[in-house]
Curated annotation (Swiss-Prot):
Homodimer. It catalyses: tRNA(His) + L-histidine + ATP = L-histidyl-tRNA(His) + AMP + diphosphate + H(+). Keywords: Aminoacyl-tRNA synthetase, ATP-binding, Cytoplasm, Ligase, Nucleotide-binding, Protein biosynthesis. HAMAP family: His_tRNA_synth. This is Histidine--tRNA ligase. It is found in: Cytoplasm. One of its GO terms (cellular component) is cytoplasm. NCBIfam families: hisS. Belongs to the class-II aminoacyl-tRNA synthetase family. It comes from Francisella philomiragia subsp. philomiragia (strain ATCC 25017 / CCUG 19701 / FSC 153 / O#319-036). Its EC number is 6.1.1.21. GO terms for biological process: histidyl-tRNA aminoacylation. Pfam families: HGTP_anticodon, tRNA-synt_His. GO terms for molecular function: ATP binding; histidine-tRNA ligase activity.
Length: 424
C-alpha cells in the first residue's frame, strides 16, 4: 500500500513552527484590541455564487484558482479563496450594517487557491482580514492605513516595507475612464495577452494589473486614471497622502494599482517588500463601498485589508524578528510507579497552584534511571523526585539539572513556595 502524503501546496504546522504563529497571532490581537476591532469566525465553505458576484467571474481567482465542487444536493460550493466576500455575506445576513450601524471586525484563518506553490505562496494559506463597515468619511481610511502600518511597526519591520496606493475614484469616474481606455486599446487588440483580451468585455480596468511585459508596453501611453477622477475624490486622496506624510510613512503613489479583485472602489493600497526576492505584496486592501449593496444588502461604506501570514512570517524570519524558540520545561517530575495516583495528584496540584510553571514528566514511567536520562535531555531547570521514601518523609527530592548544586529535600508543605521561585 502506498504511503499517504500531504496534498501539494498544503502544509503541516509542526510544534517548532507553532510557537512562531502564536507569537504573531498574539501581536495581531493586541494591536487590533487597541483599536476596538472585534473578532469574527467565518466558514471556510461558501456558495460559489458569492465569489462570482463579489471577486468577479473574470478575476484570476475565480476563473483559474478556486476549489469548487457540487455537493450531494446539487449545490455548487467553493472553499473560500479570500475572506472579504464571506465577511460581507455575514454582515448582510445578520443585518450588522443596516440603518447606519457601524462594525469594526477582524478574522484569521485558512484560504484556498489552486496556484503554483512557491515560497510564501501555498494552495492553503493563512490570512488576516481587517474590515470596517458603515463608515463613509476619510477618518476610517486613515485608521485602516494606520493599523496596517502599526502592525509592521510593532513587529519591527516597518523599514522593510513600502506602501503603494492609488485612488480608483467614483463609479462614474471609472466608467468614463473605462471608455477612454477601451478606445485607446482598440488598435492594440492583437498585442494584448490572452487574459487581458478576456477582460476587455467584463473588467477592462484589470488590464492595468497585467503582469505581461508586452501588455505593459502597450499601456505605457494609455490614459491615466488620475486624469478622470472628480475633485472630491482627488481632494480626499491628497488629504490621505498628507496624513501619511505627517505620520512618517514610507509610501509611493502607483497609478497602475487597481487590485486583483473586482469589488474595489476609491482608495486601494498594497504594502510591498523586496526582502523576499522579487518585490512582493505582504498586505493589500482598499475601499469597496458598492459590495454590500451588490450582494443584496443595504448600501454602506466598507474598507479593509488582508495580510498573508506565511509571507509575513518569512519576512519576520529573514529580518531576525521572531523570538527564539523556548520549549524547555521548568520542572521535570520523576515518579515512582508504585505511588502513581498520589504522585499524579501532587503534580496536578502544582499545576493548579502555579499555572505559569512548565511541567514535564515521562508518562511511560520507566525506571528511575531512564526517567533521569529523559530529565537531563529535557533541559529542565530541576528534577523533582516523588519516590516512596520521599513520600514517607512527607517530602520530595530536588535535583538541579542546570546548576552545580547538591541534591536536596523539600518538605511537601513548602513545595509550592519553592517552585514559585523556579517559575520567575
Amino acid at each position: 500500500m502506498s504511503k499517504l502524503t500531504i496534498i501539494r501546496g498544503f502544509n503541516d504546522i509542526l510544534p517548532q513552527e507553532s510557537c512562531k504563529w502564536q507569537f504573531l497571532e498574539s501581536k495581531i490581537k493586541s494591536i487590533l484590541d487597541k483599536y476596538n476591532y472585534d473578532e469574527v469566525r467565518l466558514p471556510v465553505l461558501e456558495k460559489s455564487e458569492l465569489f462570482h458576484r463579489s471577486v468577479g467571474e473574470t478575476s484570476d481567482i475565480v476563473s483559474k484558482e478556486t476549489y469548487d465542487f457540487v455537493d450531494r444536493s446539487g449545490e455548487s460550493l467553493t472553499l473560500r479563496p479570500e475572506g472579504t466576500a464571506g465577511c460581507v455575506r455575514m454582515v448582510i445576513e445578520n443585518s450588522l450594517a443596516n440603518r447606519g450601524q457601524t462594525q469594526k471586525l477582524w478574522y484569521s484563518g485558512p484560504m484556498f487557491r489552486y496556484e503554483r506553490p512557491q515560497k510564501g505562496r501555498y494552495r492553503q494559506f493563512y490570512q488576516l482580514g481587517v474590515e470596517a463597515y458603515g463608515y463613509d468619511n476619510i477618518a476610517i481610511d486613515l485608521e485602516i492605513l494606520t493599523i496596517s502600518w502599526n502592525l509592521f511597526r510593532e513587529l519591527g519591520i516597518s523599514e522593510c516595507v513600502k506602501l503603494e496606493l492609488n485612488s480608483l475614484g467614483s463609479s462614474s469616474n471609472r466608467q468614463e475612464y473605462t471608455k477612454a481606455l477601451l478606445e485607446y486599446l482598440k488598435p492594440y487588440h492583437a498585442q494584448l495577452d490572452e487574459d487581458s483580451i478576456k477582460r476587455l468585455d467584463k473588467n477592462p480596468l484589470r488590464i492595468l494589473d497585467s503582469k505581461n511585459e508586452q501588455t505593459q508596453q502597450v499601456l505605457a501611453n494609455a490614459p491615466k486614471l488620475i486624469d478622470f477622477i472628480d475633485e472630491d475624490s482627488l481632494t480626499r486622496f491628497e488629504q490621505t497622502c498628507e496624513y501619511l506624510d505627517n505620520l512618517g510613512v514610507n509610501y509611493q503613489v502607483n497609478q497602475k494599482l487597481v487590485r486583483g479583485l473586482d469589488y474595489y472602489s476609491g482608495l486601494v493600497f498594497e504594502w510591498v517588500t523586496d526582502r523576499l526576492g522579487a518585490q512582493a505584496a505582504v498586505c493589500a486592501g482598499g475601499r469597496y463601498d458598492n459590495l454590500i449593496e451588490s450582494l443584496g444588502g443595504q448600501k454602506a461604506g466598507a474598507i479593509g485589508f488582508a495580510i498573508g501570514l506565511e509571507r509575513l512570517l518569512l519576512l519576520l524570519e529573514s529580518e531576525g524578528k521572531l523570538p527564539i524558540e523556548d520549549d524547555k520545561s521548568d520542572v521535570f517530575f520523576i515518579l515512582d510507579n508504585n505511588q502513581l495516583h498520589r504522585s499524579l495528584l501532587l503534580v496536578e496540584n502544582v499545576r493548579q497552584e502555579l499555572p505559569a510553571l512548565k511541567i514535564d514528566m515521562d508518562l511511560k514511567f520507566g525506571s528511575f534511571k531512564s526517567q533521569f536520562k529523559k530529565a537531563d535531555k529535557s533541559d529542565a531547570k530541576i528534577a523533582v523526585i516523588i519516590g516512596q521514601d520521599e513520600l514517607l518523609q512527607q517530602a520530595v527530592g530536588v535535583k538541579y539539572l542546570q546548576q552545580d548544586k547538591q541534591q536536596e529535600q523539600i518538605p511537601l508543605n513548602k513545595l509550592i513556595n519553592f517552585l514559585e521561585k523556579i517559575a520567575i
